[in-house]
């Protein structure tokens, strides 16, 4: 069974025991989180589609760790002006392990 969940402005296709990196969640490592914004749940012809979410469907996950992504450099240069600016950014991520998918 699989599900499509929405978190952090993105959609992820998940299955039981899947490990996935998502946008940062405010939860401690080892804590359990629940995703209630489930868009699709099921398998094959038995899949249920939400409008926009499937009622009563919950995806449970365990927080494995928090980390940061690769550094992205934002560089701006104005030609012939002796002007340049460089700025780096590292996005915060949370690694979760899907433990259970509960259909309505």
Swiss-Prot record:
UniProt record, GO biological process: translation
UniProt xrefs under SUPFAM superfamilies: L21p-like
GO cellular component: cytoplasm; ribonucleoprotein complex; ribosome
Keyword set, alphabetical order: Ribonucleoprotein, Ribosomal protein, RNA-binding, rRNA-binding
InterPro entries: bL21-like, bL21-like_sf, Ribosomal_bL21
Domain of life: Bacteria
Record bears the keyword Ribosomal protein: yes
One GO molecular-function entry: structural constituent of ribosome
Its job: This protein binds to 23S rRNA in the presence of protein L20.
Quaternary structure (record): Part of the 50S ribosomal subunit. Contacts protein L20.
Protein family: Belongs to the bacterial ribosomal protein bL21 family.
Protein name: Large ribosomal subunit protein bL21
Gene: rplU
